[in-house]
């Protein structure tokens, strides 16, 4: 590995693999930059002076069981390529961890802006901000309308008992990353487990749907939905609830989470939910349970990132404040369920 290579990506070995499996794709010496802003899988923009691609691989060090599955990401963007959901072109999947030290996949580079802050949106004006937020919701509706079997994803997950399995999965991953006491986390889990709603029609779900996981083109349309590592078949309201949870960042004082939803012109939570419900035709009457579950899930994800940070296994800046937000997520998740009574 050359000293100029980014952490976790040997460019010489990557080039050799691409030459062997996609002859003619690469024309010159590869360079790479780590994409900042991600908190889980590592993302690199790789170029040869003529073309650019994106490479994704799992994080360095401690990796949670069932998480960071490159095969799932590659499979879902391959399946969605010819649907109304905009995704990059899937180019190559490598399941041989010996090539660069972990599984990875290569996809096309898509032009677009990942808006992350209210200041970025404020520069566009209220009208454009509203248009982008509406496009975000509409793209989610489009995703949930895709027939999984028609795009080769009929066996992508097991929607029966999805919510119960999700609770077990995230509790297991919490236990795998537990390195400190987290007051209220057991109460939140138990409250959720005692009141699991009956799911409606299942769909392909993204698992981490939010504004800074999409690219927006110059016409304020979504040019690509990214970061599919938690996608599966399941209850689509989990996607909507996570979008709502991210929009309520101010209630939990998470300064490291995108504050884009506070930009002038961005629709309120009620407006987002109403637009989704009207366009999808889905029943959102029990959304509070899903939002509480979203806070539980976020708490587990961030605790895993905090654990890797304390072990020195994160790449890039901005991880030092992640752990402080976990108790706030737990507290707000419990408050939402108590409001239901």
Which residue ranges define each predicted feature?
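All-alpha amphipathic helical-bundle segments outside canonical DNA-binding/catalytic cores
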Residues: 157-158, 283-294
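Active-site activation/catalytic loop segments of kinase-like enzymes and analogous catalytic loops
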Residues: 238-280, 294-312
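Activation of the activation-loop gatekeeper triad in protein kinase-fold domains
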Residues: 226-231
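Juxta-kinase regulatory segment immediately upstream of eukaryotic protein kinase catalytic domains
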Residues: 1-25
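Catalytic-loop of the protein kinase fold
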Residues: 204-206, 211
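ATP-binding pocket architecture of kinase catalytic cores
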Residues: 31-187, 195-204, 217-219
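Helical subdomain adjoining the active site within ATP-dependent kinase catalytic cores
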Residues: 282, 286, 300-341
């Amino acid at each position: 590995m050359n000293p100029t290579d980014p952490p976790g990506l040997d460019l010489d070995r990557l080039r050799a693999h691409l030459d062997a499996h996609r002859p003619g794709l690469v024309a010159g010496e590869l360079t790479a930059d780590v994409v900042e802003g991600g908190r889980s899988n590592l993302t690199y923009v790789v170029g040869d002076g003529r073309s650019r691609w994106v490479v994704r691989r799992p994080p360095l060090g401690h990796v949670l069981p069932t998480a960071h599955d490159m095969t799932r990401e590659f499979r879902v963007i391959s399946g969605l390529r010819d649907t109304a959901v905009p995704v990059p072109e899937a180019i190559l999947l490598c399941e041989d961890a010996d090539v660069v030290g972990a599984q990875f996949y290569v996809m096309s580079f898509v032009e677009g802006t990942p808006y992350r802050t209210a200041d970025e949106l404020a520069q566009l004006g209220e009208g454009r901000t509203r248009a982008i937020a509406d496009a975000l919701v509409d793209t989610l509706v489009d995703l949930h309308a895709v027939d999984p079997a028609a795009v080769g994803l009929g066996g992508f997950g097991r929607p029966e008992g999805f919510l119960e399995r999700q609770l077990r999965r995230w509790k297991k991953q919490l236990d795998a990353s537990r390195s400190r006491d987290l007051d209220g986390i057991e109460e939140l889990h138990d409250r959720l487990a005692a009141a699991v709603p009956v799911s409606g029609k299942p769909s392909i779900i993204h698992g981490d749907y939010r504004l800074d996981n999409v690219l927006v083109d110059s016409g304020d349309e979504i040019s690509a939905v990214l970061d599919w590592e938690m996608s599966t078949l399941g209850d689509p309201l989990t996607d909507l609830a996570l979008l709502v949870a991210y929009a309520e960042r101010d209630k939990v004082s998470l300064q490291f989470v995108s504050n884009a939803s506070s930009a002038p012109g961005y629709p309120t939570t009620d407006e987002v939910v109403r637009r989704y419900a009207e366009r999808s035709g889905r029943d959102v009457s029990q959304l509070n349970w899903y939002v509480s579950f979203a806070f539980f899930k976020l708490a587990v994800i961030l605790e895993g990132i905090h654990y890797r940070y304390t072990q020195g296994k994160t790449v890039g800046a901005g991880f030092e404040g992640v752990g402080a937000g976990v108790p706030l997520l737990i507290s707000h998740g419990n408050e939402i369920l108590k409001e239901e009574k």
